[in-house]
Amino acid sequence: MTPNTIAVEHFTKAMHLLLDETFSSVRGIFLDKNTSLFETLDTISAEEASFPVGGRCATLAAQVKHIAFYLDTVDAQVRAGKYEPVDWGEIWRTTREVSPAEWETIKANLRDSYARIKKLVDDTPAWPDEGTLGGAMATVVHTAYHLGEIRQALCVIKK
């Protein structure tokens, strides 16, 4: 390892720390206590998840489905080593009102996607280029962005 190289195990540990902070276990790195994505979603009913926060804004259900889709896309593309176009707009166009059962399924699917991303981080022995390394880091950045969107929407929804 050269002096300017990050050991894979350090990157893996850092990714797990940031993924856990974002999704499940706030340690105070960049979130306040009880504000991780899963903790936040546990406070949202299906009715609240179905509410668009503006005339053209997505529902919270769409936000959550989009996060899972993003994670699944990164996982599939990094594992395949191929980056093919996907329809990023489909979820925004099609996800509106959800039933309680549908909402629980959306949240469960997100948990599964999160587990797959953590496994991807563990399964990757080296990050061969900026694209794959950036893709891994973007899972945290992208999810944190949508967590912020969801938490801001809750200010309106839970008046």
Where are these regions (language model features)?
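Acidic/histidine-rich alpha-helical segments that form the ligand environment
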Residues: 93-127, 134-139, 143
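Short, contiguous alpha-helical
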Residues: 2-41, 46-91, 126-159
